[in-house]
């Protein structure tokens, strides 16, 4: 038996949610809940057609706050608005724009609890991303809520789920943000305010039913505009919409007239008794071109988006149109062209960045975030390249399309639980196709065992006093101490290797065209971890620590690895050359096995700030005589605007191709001539020496150069950032922040770009 309920065409409803004004139907659905199907047919006398709006099994009248009562029946996800728009064939096309929140995340992680506070600041996706998201949305409607994730934003580092309305990072476990489908917008001056989706759905339904575009194609019939009204229901009861043009409307609302007829209200009520807002249908390109302000988020009091495909709203949001202040400033003409078309930039160098100590504290302190640090570093690289005339002159193909470098953070500390007697489900376990690829570190590293003779955990020996201070010590200092223990060190290395391989393979999967170099960058303890991983490459004894890619460059920032190597009594060397001449001057095979760490990478850079108390030199561990030389200073970077103001920029731009064409091959010679003071001594000795002992000394000096060149094409490894005026005067104050201030340093960014490109 099938129950048919015939309602007027102007009834608007959503799956399993009858609007309050039609709550009288609840007794029908309750009485016939056992029926196999209930159809609601809406008859439109104007178009002389019947449209099947919903076909549910069964349809239950209920409020948004109630749950789906029949557990054995899956709630429908079909969008009513989508079906209604199909029935009207002559309606103007709707230019949809998708937005994403930037201030308050839905969750702090993929598996974390949902936050109660709603987002206030939204930004529009690029036109290309918005188009892809809309296609995925329409496909999800057709497939009953089944959709594929859409990769969006610069370099496609984030993924959108249109069904759950969520934006989440792809390559790391980070905050999940809300997205919003913009169809109708509040128009106030030169700004557009996207309507909340439930409100926009009702306004669009009234637009399709009233068809104002048919009578107002010439924008002349103002009298008819007053009759084109549409009452709002649900949380917006008491308000109504007046359609004043082919894509314009006014939203009018006042609680005093909540129970008064819309027609009476239009004819007799003073305009001062109620408020109104201008509405615009669609995110039109002409509005973008007419605006000159950049696209920046502006705070709002209340703005929420749906989290279901059926455009249901959260009744706890207490949303009213008058409280909508989530302004989306329209971009300038130049920004608008970027939004409409965003070419995919070519990436030639992928940098995987490993954090050091203190990241465990990020679970308690939001300001401690390695993801944010790498985001700042990525922006600094981009800004530096765009303001560097020498780099743009040497690499003109990269100008305007990015710097050819991509940086991805590697978070390993959350995988390691020292002394925690509980299972840890990896947040990335669902991202992999098989169990071998998952990073499920379910077993505890403290060997927690219920037997009496087992090793106690950290929780067992901890004293429950001064908890805050002990947490800081546990989250920061304990990382270094435990890494010195072989048991924990092996676990950390295994976890980092799995993360590195996962990041690389996932990036190759999302960017199949990538065929560039892969470099590793480690900060603090992270540099020490990567150093150990690189020196194990090619060694069959450490098969579980092998990487899926060769390492081109290794950057160590603020690293203590020089201290650790010295304490272990080990020297550092580059790959063993294959020529007979070089082999005769190299270490013996026995020395490589016992006291030398061999790095399997093309270039090794040890970069530090002079006041960083954590960093140490490594060149004396390669050649002891290098201790006589000061670290190579990294020159200050002068942005393009500074050079242009003095007229030097035009000279560089004009002769850059001639002067800098050999930048990559000549930078090594430049650095060596400036830094290696013993080079002149070697030349003098070669010219003046005639005896055998002096010749042996010459070969020994050449041997020093050869060993340095094995580890770096420039012949140097230790590179030091220059101090500022305040750093020199207040060195102890500067030391407090020097260890964490690498990510926004333009001198460092410019130096790394010159070495990579």
Swiss-Prot record:
The active site annotation covers 524
An example Gene Ontology molecular-function term = phospholipase activity
Q: Where in the cell is it found?
A: Mitochondrion
What sequence ranges are listed for the domain DDHD?
547-757
Q: Which InterPro entries match?
A: AB_hydrolase_fold, DDHD_dom, PA-PLA1_DUF7131
Give the compositionally biased regions (Polar residues).
302-329
Listed A to Z, the keywords are: Hydrolase, Lipid degradation, Lipid metabolism, Mitochondrion, Transit peptide
The molecule here is called Probable phospholipase C20G8.02, mitochondrial
């Amino acid at each position: 038996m099938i129950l048919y309920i015939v309602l007027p065409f102007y009834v608007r409803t959503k799956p399993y949610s009858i609007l309050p004004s039609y709550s009288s139907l609840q007794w029908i659905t309750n009485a016939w809940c056992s029926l196999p199907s209930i159809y609601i047919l809406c008859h439109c006398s104007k178009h002389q057609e019947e449209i099947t709006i919903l076909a549910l099994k069964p349809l239950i009248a209920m409020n948004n706050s109630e749950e789906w009562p029949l557990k054995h029946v899956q709630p429908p996800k079909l969008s009513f608005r989508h079906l209604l728009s199909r029935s009207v064939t002559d309606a103007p096309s709707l230019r949809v724009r998708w937005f994403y929140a930037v201030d308050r995340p839905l969750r702090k992680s993929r598996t974390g609890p949902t936050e109660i506070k709603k987002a206030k600041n939204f930004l529009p996706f690029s036109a290309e991303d918005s188009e892809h998201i809309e296609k995925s949305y329409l496909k999800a409607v057709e497939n009953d809520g089944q959709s594929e994730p859409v990769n969006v934003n610069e370099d496609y580092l984030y993924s959108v789920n249109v069904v759950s309305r969520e934006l989440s990072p792809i390559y790391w476990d980070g905050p999940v943000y809300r997205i919003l489908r913009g169809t109708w917008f509040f128009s106030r001056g030169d700004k557009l305010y996207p309507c909340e989706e439930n409100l926009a759905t009702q306004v669009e339904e009234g637009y399709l039913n009233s068809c104002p575009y048919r009578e107002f194609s010439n924008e002349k019939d103002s009298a008819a505009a007053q009759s084109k009204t549409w009452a709002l229901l649900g949380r917006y009861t008491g308000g109504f919409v007046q359609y004043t043009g082919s894509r314009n409307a006014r939203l009018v609302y006042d609680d005093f007239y909540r129970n008064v007829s819309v027609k009476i209200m239009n004819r007799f009520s003073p305009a001062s008794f109620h408020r109104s807002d201008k509405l615009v249908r669609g995110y039109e390109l002409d509005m973008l071109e007419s605006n000159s302000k950049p696209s920046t988020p502006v705070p709002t009091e209340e703005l929420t988006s749906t989290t279901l495909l059926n455009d249901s709203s959260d009744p706890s949001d207490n949303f009213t149109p008058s409280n909508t202040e989530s302004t989306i400033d329209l971009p300038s003409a130049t920004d608008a062209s970027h939004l409409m078309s965003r070419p995919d930039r070519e990436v030639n160098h992928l940098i995987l960045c490993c954090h050091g100590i203190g990241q465990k504290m990020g679970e308690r302190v939001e300001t401690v975030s390695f993801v944010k640090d790498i985001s700042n570093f990525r922006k600094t690289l981009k800004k530096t390249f765009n303001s560097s005339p020498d780099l743009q002159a040497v690499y003109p193909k990269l100008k305007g399309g990015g710097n050819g470098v991509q940086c991805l953070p590697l978070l390993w500390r959350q995988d390691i639980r020292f002394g925690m007697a509980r299972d840890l489900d990896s947040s990335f376990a669902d991202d992999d196709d098989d169990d071998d690829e998952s990073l499920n570190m379910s077993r505890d590293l403290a060997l927690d065992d219920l037997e009496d003779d087992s090793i106690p955990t950290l929780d067992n020996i901890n004293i429950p006093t001064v908890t805050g201070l002990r947490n800081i010590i546990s989250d920061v200092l304990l990382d270094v101490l435990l890494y010195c223990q072989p048991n924990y060190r092996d676990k950390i290395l295994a976890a980092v290797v799995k993360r590195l391989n996962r990041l690389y393979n996932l990036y190759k999967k999302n960017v199949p065209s990538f065929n560039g170099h892969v470099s590793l960058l480690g900060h603090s303890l992270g540099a020490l971890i990567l150093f150990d991983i690189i020196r194990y490459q090619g060694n069959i004894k450490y098969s579980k620590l092998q990487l899926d890619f060769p390492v081109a460059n290794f950057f160590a920032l603020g690293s203590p690895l020089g201290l650790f190597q010295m304490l272990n009594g080990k020297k550092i060397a580059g790959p063993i050359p294959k020529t007979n001449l070089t082999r005769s001057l190299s270490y013996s095979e026995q020395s490589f096995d016992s006291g030398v760490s061999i790095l399997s990478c093309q270039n090794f850079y040890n970069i530090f700030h002079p006041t960083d108390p954590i960093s140490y030199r490594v060149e004396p561990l390669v050649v002891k005589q290098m201790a006589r030389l000061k670290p190579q200073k990294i020159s200050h970077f002068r942005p393009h605007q500074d050079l242009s103001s003095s007229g030097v920029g035009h000279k560089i731009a004009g002769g850059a191709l001639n002067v800098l064409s050999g930048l990559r091959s000549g930078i090594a010679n430049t650095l060596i001539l400036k830094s290696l003071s013993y080079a002149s001594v070697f030349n003098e000795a070669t010219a003046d020496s005639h005896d055998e002992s002096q010749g042996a000394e010459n070969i020994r000096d050449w041997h020093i150069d050869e060993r340095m060149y094995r580890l770096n094409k420039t012949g140097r490894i230790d590179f030091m950032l220059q101090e500022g005026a305040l750093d020199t005067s207040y060195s102890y104050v500067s030391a407090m922040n020097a260890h964490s201030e690498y990510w926004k340093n333009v001198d460092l960014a410019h130096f790394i770009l010159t070495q990579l490109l």
